[in-house]
Amino acid sequence: MEATSLLSEIRSLNIAYLRLARRLLATDQALATTALGISQSMGEALLTLDEEACVRMAQTNLFLCRIHFDDRVLAALLAGPRLELLESPASAGKAAPAIA
């Protein structure tokens, strides 16, 4: 794979991550900062960015997110139906499924 293709994919991932992070933060900042592994002040800073600033920020050769695989979650996903870790409107107020 060419370096320019890799750079393009990294930038695409970065902008997708920033957009998702901002949507999560706008919905529930406390839950989002925990799920994203960022501080409250970083969450607030991300919320102040407009789309143009997000695109500029994404234009780097560095990943803006860290991917962390959780063995328990992956094992649960492999063993059964889809596991939802974030509360959806349909499941609001219901307990989250246990991870064995």
From Swiss-Prot:
Known role:
Functions in complex with FlhC as a master transcriptional regulator that regulates transcription of several flagellar and non-flagellar operons by binding to their promoter region. Activates expression of class 2 flagellar genes, including fliA, which is a flagellum-specific sigma factor that turns on the class 3 genes. Also regulates genes whose products function in a variety of physiological pathways.
> What's the name of the protein?
Flagellar transcriptional regulator FlhD
Q: Which GO terms describe its molecular function?
A: DNA binding
Instruction: Give the record's GO CC terms.
Output: cytoplasm
UniProt keyword annotation of DNA-binding present: yes
Give the quaternary structure. Homodimer; disulfide-linked. Forms a heterohexamer composed of two FlhC and four FlhD subunits. Each FlhC binds a FlhD dimer, forming a heterotrimer, and a hexamer assembles by dimerization of two heterotrimers.
Among InterPro entries, the record links this protein to: Flagellar_FlhD, FlhD_sf
What the record says about family reads: Belongs to the FlhD family.
Q: Which Pfam families match?
A: FlhD (PF05247)
The answer to whether UniProt assigns keyword DNA-binding to this entry is yes
Q: Where in the cell is it found?
A: Cytoplasm
